[in-house]
């Protein structure tokens, strides 16, 4: 039995176009145990009214890489966010970023908080605390 504890992950989303949390964004979590290993889907959740996703599944022991998939198209469609922007768009072409996939490395025993700052035409992500 290993004495190493597993890493853990949390996230939240802020919609920088309105200065508010992004509520109701579906997030999927996948992990792998090495750079050449296959991704294993672990499950997912959705952001709450504070933009937080508090119940992502635990990471399996031996996880070295994590992928968070943020399904942003439905959020932007619901908010009609792109229609409120001045940027030229092809009518009915859908969200410019229909999804955002973030992949990062983890080490056992550490917590990784990975916030997403999002707007209809850009995003930024960082390791939080």
Task: Please give the residue ranges for each predicted region.
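Feature of secretome-associated and extracellular-like proteins
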Residues: 2, 65-129
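Short, acidic Ser/Thr/Gly-rich low-complexity loop/linker segments typical of extracellular
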Residues: 36-54
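Charged, well-structured alpha/beta interaction segments
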Residues: 17-19, 28-30, 49, 53-54
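Short Pro-Gly-centered beta-turn/loop motif in secreted/extracellular proteins
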Residues: 54-64
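Short hydrophobic alpha-helix segments
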Residues: 17, 25, 43-46, 57
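Beta-strand signatures of extracellular beta-sandwich domains
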Residues: 26-30, 67-69
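Beta-strand-rich domain onsets/edges
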Residues: 1-23, 31, 123
């Amino acid at each position: 039995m290993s004495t190493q504890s597993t890493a853990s992950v949390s996230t939240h989303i802020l919609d920088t176009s309105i200065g508010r949390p992004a509520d109701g964004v579906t997030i999927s979590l996948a992990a792998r145990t090495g750079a050449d290993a296959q991704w294993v889907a672990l499950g997912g959740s959705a952001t709450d009214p504070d933009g937080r996703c508090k119940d992502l599944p635990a990471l399996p022991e031996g996880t070295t890489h994590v992928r968070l998939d943020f399904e942003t198209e439905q959020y932007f469609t619901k908010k009609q966010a792109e229609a409120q922007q001045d940027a030229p768009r092809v009518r009915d072409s859908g969200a410019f970023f229909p999804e955002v996939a973030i992949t990062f490395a983890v080490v056992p025993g550490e917590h990784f908080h990975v916030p997403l700052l999002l707007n209809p035409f850009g995003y930024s992500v960082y390791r939080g605390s």
